[in-house]
């Protein structure tokens, strides 16, 4: 889920290092701190370059810059859009390798009880180690704990891998879609919305 409405599109210790590969020790998910912003920015840049690699030209991909994303995350953590917005990070030991942002849905048909996974990403080098499932489970628990009874998220219509992952976690398409312009050249991508009742959402397994 590489986009985000309320946080950057995707803050003491600075974990802005290249993600480790191989065996993962002490994997966890937690609420982000302000000092995590540099690491989250780097992860988001890598996630976006990977997600849009077959959609955008290389010169646009090169503009996905960790420090730029980090500045926006730092501002969002210092002054959240609302008390119901939360940024979570996934860690391998002390190293941030993924992130998830949750909050109220901004969709036109949303109610006060409609929550949204606004962003979810794991660094490409750290995937297949359970971080995505751990972050999604933490995101669902966080939304439920803040009084939301549904969760939604938007994904690229062509992203079959993410679609399968979210289907397995209990989300399903609700027929909503949108077309977004994602660069100054006017490139348009289609996104579809997946939703789940938080009373029935299952625990995700990566």
Regions found by a protein language model. Name each.
Residues 2-5, 13-15, 22, 31-34, ...:
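Acetyl-CoA-dependent GNAT
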Residues 26-28:
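Extreme N-terminal starter segment of soluble prokaryotic enzymes
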Residues 43, 146, 168-169:
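Structural motif
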Residues 123-125, 129, 157-158:
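Active-site acidic-Proline motif in GNAT/NAT acetyltransferases
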Residues 135, 159-162:
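Conserved short alpha-helix immediately C-terminal to the canonical SAM/SAH-binding motif I
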Residues 143-155:
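Conserved GNAT acetyl-CoA-binding A-motif
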Residues 152-155, 163, 167-193:
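Conserved catalytic-core motifs of GNAT/GCN5-like acyltransferases
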């Amino acid at each position: 889920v590489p986009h985000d409405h309320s946080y950057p599109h995707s803050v003491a210790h600075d974990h802005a290092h290249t993600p480790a590969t191989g065996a993962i020790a002490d994997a966890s998910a937690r609420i982000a701190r302000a000092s995590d912003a540099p690491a989250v920015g780097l992860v988001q840049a890598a996630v976006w370059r990977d997600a849009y690699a077959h959609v955008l030209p290389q010169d646009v991909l090169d503009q996905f810059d960790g420090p730029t994303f980090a500045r926006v995350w730092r501002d969002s953590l210092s002054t959240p859009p609302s008390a119901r917005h939360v940024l979570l990070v996934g860690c391998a030991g002390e190293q941030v390798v993924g992130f998830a942002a949750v909050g109220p849905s901004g969709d036109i048909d949303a109610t006060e009880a409609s929550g949204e996974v606004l962003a979810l990403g794991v660094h490409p080098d750290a995937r297949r180690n359970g971080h995505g499932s751990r972050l999604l489970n933490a995101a669902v628990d966080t939304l439920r704990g803040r009084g939301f009874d549904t969760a939604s998220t938007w994904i690229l219509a062509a992203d079959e891998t993410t679609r399968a992952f979210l289907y397995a976690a209990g989300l399903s398409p609700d027929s909503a879609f949108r077309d977004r312009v994602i660069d100054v050249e006017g490139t348009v991508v289609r996104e579809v919305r997946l939703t789940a009742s938080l009373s029935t959402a299952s625990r995700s397994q990566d």
